[in-house]
């Protein structure tokens, strides 16, 4: 069976055979060959330099040791590059009397499965190799390392034997028939799969062609429809031109021009009225805001020590623009600092939060009539924000009360941000 793997991986490895195992370098002609030596092999990752497989001990003819039942870990099954280390036990007669048994690596080979040399479907006993050279069995045949000396030492057939072979009848062993049957079955499977793939591709091509033909027909119908509409428009345009040409002195065109000018004048008047109304509404809103500020000046909301809005007012006028810039969010650190400084000031803190929320509610809902991101229901010192959270500093130190207060304060600060964005459009000062 010929080789059929397009890409070889460790998961295709079946066994490893090591040929001509020797502890002595034969090129130096030193020492003698040892008959039987226990050996094992180690497969090592070339990147991490860590072994991922160690075989069992094998003892036999050193001309060829066969290592089977290779169990490769799953993380290395797709590996194509690894290193084979051949370890052998040094015979006792080569050691000193006081030395324990010793092992050594007789050879180390780096194996790239994509660069192996194909030998055949079966291992040939007439192949001679260099010493300590491995042969690798994949699922599609036997391979050897590249650039290694491999010689075939088959028996020479004499002429007499060759003549006798002519008179012999050709025989077909059972194993050859089995191999031929497997090869025929494999070839038939390949042809069948090829035919199935060809039929699928032909069906896809036909379906794609049909889809393209349908789209082309749709485009052609749309083009015809557009051309017919264009023809209708051309006819209407021609009729309009004929009607215009029938006009005597162009008085009707002058009437059309006068009507256009009239429309422009009316639009300018309406726009001017709307602009004046808008300015009047903005002035009224500013006036209401200043009145609201004057009302809350009687509270401690703007007090620098107790209040939550740090803004200094003059005696005669209020700079609305400066007030808008200084309208700040309530800091949780500010609340806790005041509480730590005056532990009995919980009622004052809640009163300031209530005044601040009442200020936002009156201006948003009554003056500018704008909704806030989170609804505010004023209930004195226990204002409800977002319909479920109380904006009041908790007297109890429980974790749940603190979390609810923090959520309510964050929602209230988002309302202040919405409020200041609208106030940012006010750029003029109003004098009281």
Swiss-Prot record:
Compartments (UniProt record): Golgi apparatus, trans-Golgi network membrane; Endosome membrane
Membrane topology type: Single-pass membrane protein
Main localization of the protein described in the UniProt heading: Golgi
InterPro entries hit by this protein: Vps38
Keyword flag Transmembrane helix: yes
Phenotype upon gene inactivation: Deletion was unsuccessful, possibly because VPS38 is essential for cell growth.
GO cellular component: endosome membrane; Golgi apparatus; phosphatidylinositol 3-kinase complex, class III, type II
Coiled-coil regions listed: 216-287
Keywords: Coiled coil, Endosome, Glycoprotein, Golgi apparatus, Membrane, Transmembrane, Transmembrane helix
Source species, domain of life: Eukaryota
UniProt KW Flavoprotein keyword: no
Glycosylated residue positions: 20
Transmembrane regions listed in the UniProt entry: 348-365
Family: Belongs to the VPS38 family.
Task of the protein: Involved in endosome-to-Golgi retrograde transport as part of the VPS34 PI3-kinase complex II. This complex is required for the endosome-to-Golgi retrieval of PEP1 and KEX2, and the recruitment of VPS5 and VPS7, two components of the retromer complex, to endosomal membranes (probably through generating a specific pool of phosphatidylinositol 3-phosphate allowing the recruitment of the retromer complex proteins to the endosome). Mediates the interaction between VPS30 and the VPS34-VPS15 core complex, leading to the recruitment of VPS30 to the membrane.
Quaternary data: Component of the VPS34 PI3-kinase complex II composed of VPS15, VPS30, VPS34 and VPS38.
Protein name (Swiss-Prot/TrEMBL): Vacuolar protein sorting-associated protein 38
């Amino acid at each position: 069976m010929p080789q059929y793997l397009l890409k070889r991986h460790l998961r295709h490895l079946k066994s490893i055979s090591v040929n001509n195992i020797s502890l002595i370098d034969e090129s130096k002609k030193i020492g003698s060959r040892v008959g039987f030596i226990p050996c094992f092999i180690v497969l090592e990752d070339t990147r991490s330099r860590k072994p991922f497989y160690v075989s069992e001990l094998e003892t036999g003819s050193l001309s060829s040791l066969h290592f089977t039942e290779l169990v490769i870990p799953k993380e290395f099954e797709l590996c194509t590059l690894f290193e084979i280390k051949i370890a052998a036990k040094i015979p006792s007669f080569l050691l000193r009397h006081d030395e324990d048994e010793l092992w050594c690596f007789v050879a180390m080979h780096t194996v790239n499965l994509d660069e192996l040399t194909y030998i055949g479907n079966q291992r040939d006993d007439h192949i001679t190799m260099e010493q300590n050279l491995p042969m690798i069995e994949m699922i599609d045949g036997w391979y050897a390392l590249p650039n290694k000396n491999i010689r075939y030492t088959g028996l020479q057939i004499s002429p007499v034997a060759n003549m006798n072979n002519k008179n012999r009848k050709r025989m077909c062993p059972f194993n050859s028939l089995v191999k031929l049957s497997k090869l025929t079955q494999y070839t038939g499977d390949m042809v069948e799969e090829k035919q199935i793939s060809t039929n699928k591709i032909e069906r896809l091509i036909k379906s794609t062609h049909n889809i393209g033909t349908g789209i082309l027909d749709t485009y052609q119908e749309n083009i015809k429809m557009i051309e017919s509409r264009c023809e209708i428009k051309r006819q209407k345009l021609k009729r309009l031109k004929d009607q215009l040409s029938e006009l005597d002195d162009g008085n009707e065109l002058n009437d059309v021009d006068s009507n256009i000018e009239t429309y422009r004048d009316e639009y300018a008047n309406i726009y001017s009225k709307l602009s004046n109304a808008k300015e009047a509404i903005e002035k009224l809103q500013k006036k209401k805001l200043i009145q609201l500020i004057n009302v809350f000046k009687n509270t401690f909301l703007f007090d620098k020590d107790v209040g939550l809005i740090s803004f200094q007012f003059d005696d005669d006028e209020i700079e609305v623009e400066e007030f808008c810039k200084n309208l700040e969010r309530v800091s949780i650190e500010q609340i806790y600092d005041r509480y730590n400084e005056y532990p009995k000031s919980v009622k004052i803190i809640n009163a300031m939060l209530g005044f601040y929320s009442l200020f936002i509610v009156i201006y948003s809902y009554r003056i500018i009539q704008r909704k806030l991101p989170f609804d505010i229901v004023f209930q004195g010192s226990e204002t409800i924000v977002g319909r479920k959270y109380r904006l009041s500093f908790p007297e109890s130190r429980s974790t749940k009360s603190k979390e609810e207060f923090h959520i309510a304060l964050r929602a209230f600060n988002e309302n202040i941000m919405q409020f200041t964005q609208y106030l940012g459009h006010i750029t003029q000062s109003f004098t009281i």
